[in-house]
């Protein structure tokens, strides 16, 4: 793909309408997913999940353990904010994926449309607003989450255009790790007009470990994802290409499928020190390293 098309290509469908679809990028390419038959199933955690509007913030939605008695005495409750594909303001499309992650003991947040608001795309400020909300909610009298959120353990993850947002948020001192699914950045082109999306110049500002995942050859962002991994030289990074997964991969499989397992294990290992989860990524015999369906690389892991 020509470099000038990469940013446009990841402006995918927003509630069924393509904001940008440059020559060579078809809807079929955008929607290519791993066939469901025979695919690994999502592996939920021990917590039953409830989802609800964020108190006082109608543009945000929360996925969290229904019962919070275990937090923080027996378990920590880190925060993960999700950036949607197409930078769509509609995290409910990913509810299965986000619910699986939350079920492992995480507070998960995403954006939702506000009734009567002008239609627009999700941006980095929306992700920051979710972190701001969690900080306030952790101190709000009457909040079920008061004193329970592990604000020193904040992640931002996103898919496609949402992956751009996660890279941008990697510079926020509150964000300790990022996940970039089916996305990545390139070196800025000489003379190119300013873009709202990050370039490789954003990578040195990322200060925590990076998870980079793509859908291998059927994913038109494969080369960009790999190039992004190669350009990271200041923080640990793990790169994985799931064979035959395509650009949409498994995020819309029941419970988010294999992608949800990878995201959950990354967070469990990074924030909760779960060695079994970390075995997916650590060492030459890591479970993804020895899985014939994956091509992987890592640095500093």
Task: Locate the predicted segments by residue.
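Gly/Ser-rich "nucleophile elbow"/oxyanion-hole loop immediately N-terminal to the catalytic nucleophile
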Residues: 69-76, 121-164
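The feature captures the conserved acid-bearing segment of alpha/beta-hydrolase catalytic domains
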Residues: 176-253
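Short glycine-enriched nucleophile-adjacent loop
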Residues: 163-172
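Short amphipathic alpha-helix adjacent to the substrate-entry channel of hydrolases
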Residues: 92-110
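Alpha/beta-hydrolase-fold serine-hydrolase catalytic core, especially in secreted/extracellular enzymes
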Residues: 235, 244, 253-301
